[in-house]
């Protein structure tokens, strides 16, 4: 089987590995305009090269007063008039009841959840931790593809029997939590894209392994918009035809065939009959295009 690994609330979870007091709290990681780029103040800048899933980027390390760290974090988003600026780029599951979403303006998020803890993003730290996890996974999974900073694909064929896959990914999930203190969800199926779809179904900290003959029934009611590779263009067309679920789309292959090879490939992925390989990220042809 092929597996998809997706770290749960990665940026927040990463911060909790170094600040354990954040666990079970209402936490967001936020981003504001980077005033450090043109600042004359001393800072530590690091240029990150192309490391697989990431492009070169300039990052700055921040140093905070440990005795008053919550105030120091919030001050990162204050302008000279004391107004808060920034947007939420990640939030803990504890924030869900308050309606806070990725992209919510920080000022609104604080109004929605007055006891909110705000953390400035530290992408250098997130990348370093992601690379440590990748190095560990390369010892556990024979073929590994890093899809993003917090997602991986793996191919277990010839390594783990299909009947043993569920036990393997359960153990792997628990090992990652014990070693890195990072919660992760893992899905497994014959297709990497079905595995990715399944991961979203069992978050957070879940595992699922689904044989091909059970794919159609398990995923029949999932929205077509939730499938990897279904972009706004095809989504609008399917909506015009009143196609809302994967089961409905599987019965109308011609709607995707009209997009040529890309559409045919997408239809096979939706059916779980594609043969897309798990490949090292250095071969960027492994990315799935949206239509």
Predicted feature locations:
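Residues that scaffold, gate, or flank divalent-cation-dependent active/transport sites
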Residues: 1-149, 153, 270
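Short hydrophobic beta-strand that contains or immediately precedes a catalytic carboxylate
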Residues: 4-5, 186, 230
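Amphipathic, charged-and-aliphatic alpha-helical interface segments
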Residues: 96-100, 213-248, 268
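Generic non-transmembrane alpha-helical segments
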Residues: 132, 136-140, 171-180, 237, ...
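Short, conserved phosphate-binding/catalytic loop or strand-edge motifs used
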Residues: 149-155, 190-195
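Catalytic palm subdomain of template-directed nucleic-acid polymerases
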Residues: 154-173, 242
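Long, highly charged, low-complexity intrinsically disordered interaction regions
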Residues: 164-225
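DNA-contacting surface of Y-family translesion DNA polymerases
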Residues: 232-291
């Amino acid at each position: 089987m092929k597996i998809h690994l997706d770290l749960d609330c990665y940026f927040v979870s990463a911060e909790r590995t170094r600040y354990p007091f954040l666990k079970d709290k209402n936490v967001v990681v936020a981003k504001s305009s980077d005033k450090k780029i043109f600042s004359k103040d001393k800072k530590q800048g690091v240029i990150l090269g192309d490391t697989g899933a990431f492009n070169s980027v300039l990052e700055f390390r921040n140093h905070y007063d440990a005795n008053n760290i919550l105030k120091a974090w919030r001050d990162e988003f204050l302008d000279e008039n004391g107004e808060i600026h920034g947007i939420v780029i990640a939030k803990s599951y504890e924030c869900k009841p308050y309606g806070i979403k990725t992209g919510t303006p920080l000022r609104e998020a604080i109004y929605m959840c007055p006891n909110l803890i705000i953390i400035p993003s530290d992408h250098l730290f997130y990348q370093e931790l992601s690379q440590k996890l990748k190095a560990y996974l390369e010892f556990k999974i024979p073929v590994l593809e890093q899809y993003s900073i917090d997602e991986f694909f793996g191919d277990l064929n010839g390594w783990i029997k299909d009947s043993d896959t569920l036990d393997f990914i359960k153990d792997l999930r628990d090992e990652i939590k014990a070693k890195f203190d990072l919660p992760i969800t893992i899905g497994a199926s014959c297709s990497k894209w079905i595995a990715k779809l399944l991961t979203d179904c069992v978050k957070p900290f879940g595992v699922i392994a689904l044989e091909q003959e059970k794919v159609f029934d398990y995923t029949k009611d999932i929205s077509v918009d939730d499938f990897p590779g279904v972009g706004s263009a095809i989504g609008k067309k399917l909506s015009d035809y009143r196609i809302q679920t994967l089961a409905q789309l599987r019965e109308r292959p011609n709607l995707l065939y009209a997009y040529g090879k890309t559409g045919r490939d997408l239809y096979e992925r939706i059916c779980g009959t594609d043969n897309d390989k798990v490949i090292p990220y250095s071969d960027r042809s492994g990315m799935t295009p949206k239509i």
